[in-house]
């Protein structure tokens, strides 16, 4: 564009076409039908010089404006590209600063080696394995926080009512067991006994005097009638049921003795007419 404008400026300084110059001695009485325009060799007038100067100034000004516009557009493009690059660098710097602040605020935990070649933070290992590490290899001892292990078991032992030095292993260890020091035949009931057992009366053994009187009656009558049963119960301060049960047990005992001595499998025959 600039080269074209300069060429046009150069062409403006050339004389216009179809102009014929003539000497001063020639006359101007030629025919008006001549295709050429005569020009005298006299110096140019003031008006033609001013017009040529104005035309030259116009094209010079136009060329300068074009150069300024081209340089301005290139400057704008370069400025926009530089501003974009500055924004990108500023964003990257902000990201690096944020990453640095996060890295500085986060605690740095040194990794610990394990038997498999992997690394694990010590805090995570102590939280995941709160038990005794003595049963495991030496590499495993490095992952367990011994102070945390001691606090865990000491707190558990202090919170419980376990009377021994070692901690409880079962949740039902706090259950109080009943005392078994006393005699079980003293009529005391355990906690897990049912109510039906508590309703049963205590077994009372027969005294020697009662046993002697019952043995005398058994020598005469193996089976006792209701009247005799009532008399014995009243005399010996027993119930009729106790008298009846004693005679049943005594007959069974006598039957076994006779079977051992005589070998009779049937035993003693029951006398007729007795209950």
UniProtKB/Swiss-Prot annotation:
Disruption phenotype: RNAi-mediated knockdown in adults has no effect on their F1 progeny, but increases the frequency of posterior morphological abnormalities on a homeobox nob-1 mutant background. However, RNAi-mediated knockdown in L1 larvae causes defects in tail tip morphogenesis, which are exacerbated on a nob-1 mutant background.
Keywords: DNA-binding, Homeobox, Nucleus, Transcription, Transcription regulation
Gene3D superfamilies named in the record: Homeodomain-like (1.10.10.60)
Biased composition (Low complexity): 44-53, 70-89
GO molecular function: DNA-binding transcription factor activity, RNA polymerase II-specific; RNA polymerase II cis-regulatory region sequence-specific DNA binding
Residue span of region Disordered: 1-53, 70-116, 250-275
Biased composition (Basic residues): 250-259
The name this protein goes by in its record: Homeobox protein php-3
Protein source organism: Caenorhabditis elegans
């Amino acid at each position: 564009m600039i080269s074209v404008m300069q060429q046009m400026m150069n062409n403006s300084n050339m004389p216009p076409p179809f102009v014929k110059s003539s000497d001063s001695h020639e006359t101007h009485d030629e025919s008006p039908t001549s295709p050429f325009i005569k020009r005298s060799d006299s110096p140019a007038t003031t008006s033609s010089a001013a017009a040529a100067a104005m035309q030259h100034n116009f094209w010079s000004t136009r060329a300068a404006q074009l150069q300024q516009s081209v340089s301005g557009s290139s400057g704008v493009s370069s400025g926009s590209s530089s501003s974009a690059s500055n924004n990108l660098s500023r964003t990257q710097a902000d990201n690096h600063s944020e990453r640095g602040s996060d890295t500085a605020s986060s605690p740095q935990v040194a990794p610990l080696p394990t038997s498999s070649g992997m690394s694990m933070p010590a805090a995570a290992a102590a939280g995941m394995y709160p038990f005794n590490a003595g049963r495991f290899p030496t590499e495993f001892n490095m992952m367990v926080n011994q102070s945390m292990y001691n606090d865990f078991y000491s707190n558990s032992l202090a919170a419980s009512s376990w009377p021994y030095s070692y901690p409880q292993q079962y949740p039902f260890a706090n259950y109080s067991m009943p005392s078994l020091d006393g005699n079980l035949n003293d009529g005391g009931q355990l906690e897990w006994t049912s109510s039906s057992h508590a309703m049963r009366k205590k077994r009372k053994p027969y005294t020697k005097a009662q046993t002697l009187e019952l043995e005398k009656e058994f020598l005469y009558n193996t089976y006792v009638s209701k009247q005799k049963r009532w008399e014995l119960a009243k005399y010996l301060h027993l119930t009729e049921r106790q008298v009846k049960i004693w005679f049943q047990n005594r007959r069974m005992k006598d039957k076994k003795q006779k079977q051992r001595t005589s070998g009779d499998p049937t035993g003693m025959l029951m006398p007729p007419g007795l209950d």
